[in-house]
C-alpha cells in the first residue's frame, strides 16, 4: 500500500511510527515520475519491510524544500526518520527494492 502524504506533520508521524520508510517525491507534469509510479506501487505491494509513501512536490513545496528535492522523481529511503539512501530518475520495481536492501 502507498500512502499519499498531505502534510509535513503526517510524514513526520509516519517516521515516528515506522522504522523503514521509502518516499517517492514526484509531480504530475514529470514524465519519468509517471513511469515510476506504477513501479513504486508494485514494490509496495510486494515488499512489506517498509512503509511506502508519495509526496507531490507541487502540492507540498514545504516538504520538498525540507528534504532538498531538486530533481524528479527522487526516491529516498529513511530509517528511523534519517535519510539513508537517495536515487533520482526512473526506477523499476526491482531497483526500488534493491535501493532499500543494499
UniProtKB/Swiss-Prot annotation:
Q: Which GO terms describe its biological process?
A: cell redox homeostasis
Please, which domain of life does this record's source organism belong to? Bacteria
- Keyword Electron transport (UniProt): yes
The Swiss-Prot or TrEMBL record annotates one GO molecular function as: protein-disulfide reductase activity
**Residues of the Thioredoxin domain:** 2-102
Q: Which UniProt keywords apply?
A: Disulfide bond, Electron transport, Redox-active center, Transport
Show the disulfide pairing. 30-33
Q: Which PROSITE patterns does the entry link to?
A: THIOREDOXIN_1 (PS00194), THIOREDOXIN_2 (PS51352)
* InterPro entries, sorted: Thioredoxin, Thioredoxin-like_sf, Thioredoxin_CS, Thioredoxin_domain
One Pfam family this chain carries? Thioredoxin
PANTHER family given for it?
Answer: GEO12009P1
Please explain the role this protein plays, according to its UniProt record. Answer: Participates in various redox reactions through the reversible oxidation of its active center dithiol to a disulfide and catalyzes dithiol-disulfide exchange reactions.
Protein name listed in UniProt: Thioredoxin
Record gene name: trxA
Amino acid at each position: 500500500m502507498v500512502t499519499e502524504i498531505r502534510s509535513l506533520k503526517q510524514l513526520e508521524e509516519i517516521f515516528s511510527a515506522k522504522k523503514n520508510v521509502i518516499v517517492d517525491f514526484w509531480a504530475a507534469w514529470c514524465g519519468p515520475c509517471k513511469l515510476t509510479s506504477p513501479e513504486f506501487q508494485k514494490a509496495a505491494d510486494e515488499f512489506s519491510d517498509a512503509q511506502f509513501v508519495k509526496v507531490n512536490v507541487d502540492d507540498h513545496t514545504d516538504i520538498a524544500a525540507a528534504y532538498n528535492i531538486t530533481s524528479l522523481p527522487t526516491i529516498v529511503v529513511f530509517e528511523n526518520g534519517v535519510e539513508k539512501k537517495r536515487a533520482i530518475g526512473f526506477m523499476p520495481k526491482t531497483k526500488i527494492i534493491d535501493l532499500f536492501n543494499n
